[in-house]
């Protein structure tokens, strides 16, 4: 029997609902419960797959190929025993699309289709399906209480709390306690009004997570409890922390997990062992060195566009006991600036992306890393550009490019793949006319690493499984001239022998991959590719120190 914790936010957005929810999930998992998480997004897009990173940040890809909200990345990084799937994230657009398709098929037998019950029932069905087979499902509702877009979701939550009952549901509400400097005082009124908004919908919160920059005394907590109908011990203070990985310990010390276990009847569980989280924080706060990684991209003004890459570098720093300082370099400005701005970097990374804009700047950075012997990691488009740069400047194919940038090129080193097998082994097809949404090679795919290569050495095994999100691949017609010039194809997809990884054997550390290793990195376990990359950066730092 699954228990549900619904997570809402009030006063302002960006309070950290996802991190708070993931921290609670980590606590419950540490007590032995089987936990999953769900993110409900009120926007009308079917999924974030075609949204600009400037609008939405990164698109997180699950094992089964769902293009989802970046919060699912937090969920997976905080949980060890649960992987997110297509069931764990859905939007208003997805719900309305499903309901309208049913209406067109005649499933509603000519009845009037309405928000209540048709939309709300669809939402409830999705929540219940995602929670099936778990002890606890933590369900985050995107946006802020009172937003018009989120009303169907809030009504669905209200109905579920009534239908499932008090002993199977809880609501955790995040709110802001602003500090007024002129009065030297924390203000509780925004929290009171936020809860009032919830109550007007018919929902009473059970736990309040109060975000603040300052300590909160017992009197203030009692005042909040009095005016919100919440127990004083359920008013949880979430003061700004040095790292998000301190939040599980913070919640543990305020007995958030005890509150939940009491409510759900989990009275005989062992206490949570958070020693692994303590080790993560200890390594973060006591680095031996600082290494600088230049990340060359076109969305660098918004770090959330590369959230999982940023986190994977942080995790690799933990593994190597170094602090990773990321220097964001705009690829377009690099085309007009002196390339020597990269001279302070201990390593260079070119992440994934789409489109031609900024590609010349990225290739300048790749060439610099290759010629100067600086550790380089290319991801997705970063791999494709590494191959193009090598083809142009080493293999003698001066006009080499991708058909993404020039469909009529005579040297299509990178081309559109028209057929591939999905994660279920089923044939998928596309063409240049296909819709952008949902037409990529997505999700976990097996690859075989070539024996004797650095990539094989880094992973420590022959077969790996990594997640993909791309339309274009290296053209196998050009493998021979590329390898003859010195670049090594070090990995191929198991199913179709597509190029997955390349490296330059004569370089200290130059690896580029078609997949997205950042999606499977975690603070407690890291990822072998990023760990090796930062180890190489550390050696580069010590060499040039």
From Swiss-Prot:
Residues 292-543 form the Glutamine amidotransferase type-1 domain. Its EC number is 6.3.4.2. ATP binds at residues 14-19, 71, 239-241. The keyword Transcription does not apply. Keywords: ATP-binding, Glutamine amidotransferase, Ligase, Magnesium, Metal-binding, Nucleotide-binding, Pyrimidine biosynthesis. It catalyses: UTP + L-glutamine + ATP + H2O = CTP + L-glutamate + ADP + phosphate + 2 H(+); L-glutamine + H2O = L-glutamate + NH4(+); UTP + NH4(+) + ATP = CTP + ADP + phosphate + 2 H(+). One of its GO terms (molecular function) is identical protein binding. NCBIfam families: PRK05380.1 (NF003792), PyrG (TIGR00337). Allosterically activated by GTP, when glutamine is the substrate; GTP has no effect on the reaction when ammonia is the substrate. The allosteric effector GTP functions by stabilizing the protein conformation that binds the tetrahedral intermediate(s) formed during glutamine hydrolysis. Inhibited by the product CTP, via allosteric rather than competitive inhibition. The active site is at 380 (nucleophile), 516, 518. It comes from the Bacteria. Pathway: Pyrimidine metabolism; CTP biosynthesis via de novo pathway; CTP from UDP: step 2/2. PROSITE patterns: GATASE_TYPE_1. GO terms for biological process: 'de novo' CTP biosynthetic process; pyrimidine nucleobase biosynthetic process. The keyword tRNA-binding does not apply. Mg(2+) binds at residues 71, 140. GO terms for cellular component: cytosol. The gene is pyrG. This is CTP synthase.
């Amino acid at each position: 029997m699954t228990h549900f914790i619904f997570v809402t936010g009030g006063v302002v957005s960006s309070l950290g609902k996802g991190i708070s929810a993931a921290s609670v999930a980590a606590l419950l998992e540490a007590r032995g419960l089987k936990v999953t998480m769900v993110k409900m997004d009120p926007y009308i897009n079917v999924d974030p797959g075609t949204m600009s990173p400037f609008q939405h940040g990164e698109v997180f890809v699950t094992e089964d190929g769902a293009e989802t909200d970046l919060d699912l990345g937090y969920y997976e990084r905080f949980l060890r025993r649960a992987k997110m799937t297509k069931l764990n994230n859905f939007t208003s657009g997805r719900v309305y699309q499903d309901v309208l398709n049913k209406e067109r098929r005649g499933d509603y037998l000519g009845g009037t289709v309405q928000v209540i019950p048709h939309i709300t029932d669809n939402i409830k069905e999705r929540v219940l399906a995602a929670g099936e087979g778990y002890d606890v499902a933590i369900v985050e509702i995107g946006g802020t209480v009172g937003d018009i877009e989120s009303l169907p979701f809030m009504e669905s939550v209200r109905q579920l709390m009534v239908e499932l009952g008090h002993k199977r549901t809880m609501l955790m509400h995040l709110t802001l306690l602003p500090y007024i400097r002129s009065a030297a005082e924390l203000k509780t009124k925004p929290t009171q009004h936020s809860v009032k908004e919830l109550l007007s919908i018919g929902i009473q919160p059970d736990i309040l997570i109060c975000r603040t920059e300052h300590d909160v005394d017992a009197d203030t907590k009692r005042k909040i409890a009095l005016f919100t109908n919440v127990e004083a011990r359920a008013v949880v203070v979430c003061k700004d922390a040095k790292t998000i990985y301190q939040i599980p310990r913070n919640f543990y010390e305020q007995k958030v997990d005890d509150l939940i276990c009491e409510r759900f009847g989990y009275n005989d569980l062992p206490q949570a062992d958070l020693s692994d989280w303590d080790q993560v924080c200890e390594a973060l706060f006591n680095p031996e060195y600082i290494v600088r990684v230049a990340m060359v991209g076109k969305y660098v003004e918004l770090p959330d566009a590369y959230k999982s890459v940023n986190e994977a570098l942080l995790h690799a720093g933990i593994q190597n006991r170094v602090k990773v300082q990321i220097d964001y370099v705009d690829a377009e400005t690099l085309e007009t600036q002196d390339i020597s701005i990269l001279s302070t970097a201990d390593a260079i990374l070119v992440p994934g992306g789409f489109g031609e804009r900024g590609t010349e700047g990225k290739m300048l950075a790749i060439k610099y890393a290759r010629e100067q012997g600086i550790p380089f990691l290319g991801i997705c488009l970063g791999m494709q550009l590494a191959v193009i740069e090598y083809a142009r400047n080493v293999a003698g194919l001066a006009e080499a490019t991708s058909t993404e940038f020039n469909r009529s090129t005579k040297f299509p080193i990178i081309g559109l793949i028209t057929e591939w097998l999905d994660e279920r082994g089923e044939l998928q097809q596309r063409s240049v006319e296909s819709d952008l949404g949902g037409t990529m090679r997505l999700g976990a795919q097996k690859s075989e690493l070539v024996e004797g290569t650095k990539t094989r050495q880094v992973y420590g095994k022959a077969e790996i499984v990594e997640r993909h999100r791309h339309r274009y691949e290296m053209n196998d017609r050009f493998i021979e001239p590329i390898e003859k010039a010195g670049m090594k194809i070090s990995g191929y997809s198991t199913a179709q022998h597509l190029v997955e990884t390349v490296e330059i054997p004569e370089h200290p550390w130059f690896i580029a991959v078609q997949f997205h290793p950042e999606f499977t990195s975690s603070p407690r376990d890291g990822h072998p590719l990023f760990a090796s990359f930062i180890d190489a950066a550390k050696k580069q730092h010590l060499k040039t120190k």
